[in-house]
Design a protein with these regions (language model features):
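N-terminal "arm"/small-domain region of PLP-dependent enzymes with the aminotransferase-like
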Residues: 1-25, 30, 233-235
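Hydrophobic residues in well-ordered beta-strands that form the structural core
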Residues: 75, 96, 154-156
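Phosphate-binding glycine-rich loop
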Residues: 25-72, 86-88, 95-98, 120
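Conserved coil-to-alpha-helix start sites within the AMP-binding
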Residues: 79-84
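Helix C-cap/helix->beta junction micro-motif
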Residues: 90, 149-150, 267
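Active-site phosphate-binding strand-loop segment of PLP-dependent enzymes
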Residues: 102-192, 197-205
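Active-site region of PLP-dependent enzymes
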Residues: 161-169, 176-267
């Protein structure tokens, strides 16, 4: 019987998690930061924010981009509900575009056709979320062309595709998309039990992602120097979307054998 979401855990994984559990800090510590660095290098992105799960990643992105009632976001109908829910949670409207029959990814030619014909939609599209379904990269060159032409933010829901190649490049995602989201649920290529990540080359986005990950906290270094290390401000409504250190330790260990895990899945 083939399990829906059977994780692959080896002795190294157990060893690294055990080490993390013996540390003084097991919540969000330096292992989380190390995992972010490893993911950034793997996907050739400047910035990474790891979070509690892939759905949290999408919701943080949606809140960062400030979608609202009159906005539309183009996306695929073939995905887990979190992809469209992040749009609805912000009060915006998901507009489903059909998929390519061979790759099951968003069909950019249909995107172009819809935007050409529908001026109402064209004026209100704020973003496009494409899922690299079952590890198959979308036609990112064409999608990037469309995002530049019609001025919308391009988001890669890369939860199925960590380690995939586009034009023979595993770091393709950040070359084309403005923002990339990942999931580390057991059904994905690597797991942290639950977990997710957001990657970008935008420093402005990254600052917002990290703030929203932790209750909307804002830390001004000048004020911290004046008032003390514990001084912080909360400037917008959010919640706790943090990953803990022993999850991050598992993620680092799993990432080291990503290629082996992908080969195992292909069998």
């Amino acid at each position: 019987m083939i399990s829906y979401g059977k994780q692959s855990i080896n002795k190294d994984d157990v060893k690294e998690v055990s080490k993390a559990l013996r540390k003084n800090l097991i919540t969000q510590g330096n292992t989380v930061e190390k995992f972010e660095i490893h993911l950034s290098k793997k996907l050739k992105a400047k910035f990474c924010t790891v979070v509690s799960n892939g759905s949290s990643a999408l919701n943080i992105v949606a809140k960062t981009l400030e979608w609202s009632k009159n906005d539309f976001v183009l996306t695929t109908p073939i995905s887990f509900i979190a992809t469209s829910n992040c749009i609805l949670n912000q009060g915006a409207t998901p507009f489903f575009v059909d998929i390519d029959k061979d790759t099951y990814t968003l069909d950019p030619y249909k995107v172009e056709s819809i935007l050409k014909r529908n001026s109402f939609l064209r004026k209100r599209v704020k973003a496009l979320i494409s899922v690299d379904y079952a590890g198959h990269p979308s036609d990112w060159q064409f999608l990037k062309y469309l995002s530049n032409k019609y001025k919308f933010t391009l988001i890669n829901d890369n939860c199925h595709a960590l380690g995939s190649k586009y034009n023979d490049d595993t770091g393709y995602a950040v070359k084309y998309a403005d923002i990339i989201t990942l999931s580390f649920h057991p059904v994905k290529q690597i797991t942290t039990g639950e977990g997710g990540a957001i990657l970008t080359n935008s420093k402005m986005f990254d600052r917002r992602f990290k703030s929203l990950r932790s209750h909307g906290v804002f830390k001004n270094q000048d004020l911290i120097k004046k008032k003390g290390i514990w001084y912080q401000e909360f400037k917008e409504l959010s919640s706790n979307f943090r990953m803990n250190d022993f999850q991050a330790a598992l993620g680092i260990s799993q990432l080291k054998r990503l290629n082996k895990l992908i080969k195992k899945r292909k069998k």
